[in-house]
């Protein structure tokens, strides 16, 4: 398992967790609390993620664990990671970038989850749909709450663009990053709500 940190100017430092063939986790850039790291952090990191019985659910629980287990690795060591990190950095610099071709780890997912995933990945750059519309697109017209739950648990933000799914009367939610972050992502794509 490879963990690569990447810097996104004006956004912070994010992380990509990759198993060599597919994305396992993506942590959106957040401001860096440690001033010694700075906003120009270099891609680095190799670590191990311990799978749960149901598969890999998330990286280790604490950043100190992640940092302690890292050895220095450049993104170029894994071409798929280098490409994905480059596209993420382009996206955060304002370029129109799509991620529909990025392979993700959906092992153990239900048919419903796979259908919602496929429908969400078809939402284009600069487009938004409501939770209800996404439920219809996925073939589950009465499952808007379940779709909202799927969005809330999305471990592949941007690659699976949950930020493009909004409530019928506003932005909806965006987990621990909050509505300002979601609004900022949408504004980057030319969407104002």
Locations of regions flagged by a protein language model:
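Residue-level signal for inorganic ion chemistry
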Residues: 120, 134, 162-163, 185
């Amino acid at each position: 398992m490879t963990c690569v940190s990447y810097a996104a100017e004006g956004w912070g430092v994010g992380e990509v967790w990759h198993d060599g063939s597919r994305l396992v986790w993506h942590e959106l850039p957040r401001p860096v609390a440690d001033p010694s790291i700075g906003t120009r952090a270099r891609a680095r990191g190799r670590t191990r993620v311990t799978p749960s019985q149901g598969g890999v659910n998330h990286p280790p629980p604490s950043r100190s664990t992640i940092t302690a287990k890292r050895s220095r690795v450049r993104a170029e060591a894994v071409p798929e990671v280098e490409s994905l990190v480059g596209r993420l950095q382009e996206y955060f610099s304002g370029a129109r970038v799509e991620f529909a071709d990025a392979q993700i780890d959906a092992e153990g997912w239900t048919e419903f989850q796979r259908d919602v995933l496929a429908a969400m990945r078809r939402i284009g750059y600069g487009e938004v749909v409501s939770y209800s519309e996404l439920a219809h697109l996925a073939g589950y017209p009465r499952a808007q709450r379940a779709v909202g739950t799927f969005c809330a648990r999305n471990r592949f933000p941007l690659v699976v663009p949950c930020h493009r799914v909004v409530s019928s009367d506003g932005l909806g939610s965006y987990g621990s990053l909050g509505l300002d972050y979601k609004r900022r992502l949408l504004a980057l794509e030319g969407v104002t709500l």
